[in-house]
Design a protein with these regions (language model features):
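Zymogen propeptides/activation segments of proteases
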Residues: 25-412, 419-694
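Gram-positive cell-envelope targeting signals
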Residues: 1-39
Length: 694
């Protein structure tokens, strides 16, 4: 069981909800600065006087077993090994340990960062997680983790800090009076009463980012009859922008949760529901789930008071300023079957991570909101399932009524893992390699959770097979249009401008690269319990910008931590076979598969910076085109991909603000329109070079 240290939990709450209170209040964890000449006495050791270690020094300290990965600028992003001679017993010691490797990781004098939390795992390793700040703002994707072994020595670190940012100018905050004026402009109605004595500096998680702001309290003219929420918190950014508002039950200067979501669970009485749910295949499952009774309105809620989970309507919460229309019945009967099975599986996913002492998505019991009836702003149902961040104090998940994804524990646990990884990494860069890695972790942990729960008989590591809609195969990725190695058929290269037309850089396609390795470890003899420890510990090690080289290093690090070093060679072999180590661009260009040939052409730099893509078709029996796959120009403005030998038709889609413009490959080359397309003959082991597009 993983133990998250309670005193660091307070720091996490501060990061997510209250960074700076009014004068007189202090933090458990103040910000930290590497020492500079202007901030220390001459007799104290200064950053510039600290002897900087080299990779060779660290190798000697680590008995020749240290491992390093780097970003393009040459700074270390993952370090596995001892880099500090002193003992690390506190987060302050962890900060001190960085002085000697500042040049390796790009920490310049004046680098500003703060401790988010600390935790100790079952093996006795302690992890200190920091985030970087600049000019009063938390930098996106900037996370540093210091790992300490059971004896108190530095065991390694991972870092996605922005290197050499320097010292920011002092930031000016808007006044309390100005914040109140902005709120009055947004809510001029006279029935709002303002509690000016309690206006204060704060921070909230908004659109998955920590935003520092002023919080203004007013009365709540539209107080719910179901919950006692007499006040409203209004959030105004330091730049003077009205951000959002939420109802709350109390106000005051001692705030540990700016959104007061815990208040919704107060006053409810626990209950249970037992009943039958009809699954997609017509089979019946008996389930028992917690519910709750609200004496104020006489309704039963689909809610778990112990785990702090509630179920509410997606549209109201997302399109009506966070309104909470909870799912209720008057008699604890008649619950929607899809709601029930989805809720039930989220409880199972919650409990799996809770057994590792990760309660909720973060280990600090952030309340969970399962929003049902997913739709767009016009009310059209969306065929999806998702985790969409922490919003208004809730860890939010979306569920649809037009699919049965909630019946599949691997799909539900996939989404739950998105929340866990986002919290562990302190952010997610959901694009290209980092996005595919994020998706892969969700697939891997989702499948492990499902298999360990006995919720499937699948041995091929499929995703979604228990809801009648299998989406992926981790044992044979090509079956569901995914690559098994870098440059394989269906592989999507990194793109300059990730977006919806290119799946944010093929995040739902290339995720098979890592999940296929997880399956390979399983087939090599690693048990599900061992896989769970290996991958979960690596989640705690990686950062939002960790690429495949970093993940490889962190998996080897995790193997050391968990006593699984006998699998180190297997991990190395599988990563090598997948082409995930080193220059992946060149690996993709040179990739080959028996029975396949290559198609290649270039586009202009301007087109490569857009969202363009190429669709590939074969000819059906009726002569119509049958879609096979799509590829996009890569970061080098090249389109280069493998196809099985055969005849194909290609259509280039140019994305503009007005829509899509299509250019087919004709006998004379690329031209507007899709009639009269030429067949491109792909031959085994050969490359077909097509005309470039500008």
């Amino acid at each position: 069981m993983r133990k998250r240290q309670k005193r660091y939990g307070a720091a996490l709450a501060l990061v997510l909800s209250v960074l700076l209170l009014l004068s007189g209040c202090s933090r458990d964890f103040p910000e930290h600065f590497l020492q500079t000449e202007g901030s220390v006495q001459p007799t104290e050791k200064q950053y510039n006087d600290t002897v900087q270690l080299t990779e060779n020094d660290i190798q000697q300290m680590s008995g020749g077993k240290a491992l390093f990965t780097y970003i393009d600028q040459g700074y270390v992003t993952t370090l596995v090994g001892k880099y500090y001679e002193g003992k690390i017993e506190t987060y302050e010691d962890a900060v001190s340990s960085l002085n000697g490797i500042a040049s390796l990781i790009g920490l310049s004098a004046g680098s500003e960062f703060f401790c988010v939390y600390g935790e100790t795992d079952p093996m006795g390793y302690t992890y200190y997680t920091f985030q970087q700040k600049y000019g009063g703002l938390t930098l996106q994707y900037a996370t540093l983790k210091v790992v300490v072994d059971p004896e108190g020595h530095a065991a390694g670190l991972s870092c996605s800090f922005t290197p050499n940012v320097g010292i920011a100018e002092e930031k000016t905050f808007i006044s309390a009076a100005e914040a109140e004026r902005i709120v009055r402009q947004s809510f001029p109605e006279p029935e709002y009463r303002y509690y000016t004595d309690f206006t204060q500096k704060s921070a909230v998680t908004y659109n998955n980012r920590t935003v520092e702001c002023m919080v203004v309290y007013t009365s709540n003219p539209e107080q719910s009859v179901s919950f006692d929420m007499p006040f409203i918190e209004h959030f105004v950014t330091y730049a003077g922008e009205y951000l959002t508002s939420v109802p709350t039950s109390s106000i005051g200067s001692e705030i540990s949760d700016a959104y007061k979501t815990d208040d919704y669970f107060k006053g409810l009485t626990p209950a249970t529901y037992t009943g039958a749910v009809t699954l997609f295949d017509g089979s019946i499952r008996q389930i028992t789930v917690p519910t709750a009774y609200n004496a104020q309105d006489g309704q039963y809620y689909l809610a778990d008071l112990e785990r702090k989970i509630m179920v509410a309507d997606y549209a109201a919460f997302n399109f009506q300023n966070g309104r909470l229309d909870f799912v209720t019945t008057p008699d604890n009967q008649g619950w929607d079957g899809n709601y029930l099975i989805t809720y039930y599986n989220y409880l199972l996913a919650y409990d799996y991570y809770a057994d590792m002492n990760i309660r909720s998505i973060d280990g600090f019991e952030t309340p969970i909101l399962i929003t049902v009836n997913m739709c767009d702003a016009e009310g059209n149902p969306e065929n999806n399932a998702c985790f969409y961040g922490i919003n208004n104090g809730w860890a939010c998940f979306g569920s649809s009524q037009v699919n049965r994804y909630g019946e599949a524990l691997d799909v539900v646990a996939h989404e739950f893992t998105h929340g866990v990884t986002r919290s562990a990494m302190q952010g997610t860069k959901y694009a290209n390699e980092t996005g595919a890695i994020n998706e892969a972790y969700s697939d891997i942990m989702g499948n492990i959770i499902e298999m360990r729960a006995g919720a499937t008989t699948d041995g091929a590591w499929l995703l979604g097979e228990m809801c009648g809609e299998t989406m992926r195969s981790m044992s044979n990725p090509n079956t569901y249009a995914q690559p098994a190695f870098v440059g394989d058929v269906f592989y999507g290269a990194n793109v300059l401008n990730p977006g919806r037309y290119n799946d944010n850089g093929s995040v739902h396609t290339n995720n098979s690269l890592l999940s296929h390795i997880a399956y390979g470890l399983y087939k090599s003899g690693m048990s599900l319990a061992e896989e769970s420890r290996l991958w979960f510990t690596s989640i705690e090690l990686i950062t939002p910008l960790s690429d495949y080289d970093d993940v490889y290093a962190c998996l080897l690090f995790s193997a050391r931590i968990n006593g699984l070093e006998q699998y180190a060679d297997t991990i190395t072999r599988l990563f090598t076979e997948a082409g995930l180590l080193g220059n992946r661009e060149q690996t993709a260009y040179a990739a080959a598969r028996a029975g396949c040939g290559r198609v290649e052409f270039s586009v202009s730099d301007a087109l490569a910076q857009g969202y363009d893509f190429v669709s590939v078709y074969t000819t059906g029996q009726d002569g119509s085109g049958v879609y096979q796959l799509s590829v996009c120009p890569d970061v080098n403005a090249r389109v280069s991909f493998l196809l099985p030998a055969g005849q194909y038709m290609l259509v280039y889609a140019h994305v503009t603000q007005e829509g899509l413009a299509y250019y087919g490959y004709h006998p004379t080359g690329w031209a507007s329109g899709t009639d009269g397309l030429a067949y491109v003959q792909v031959t085994d082991g050969q490359t077909v070079y097509l005309n470039d597009i500008s």
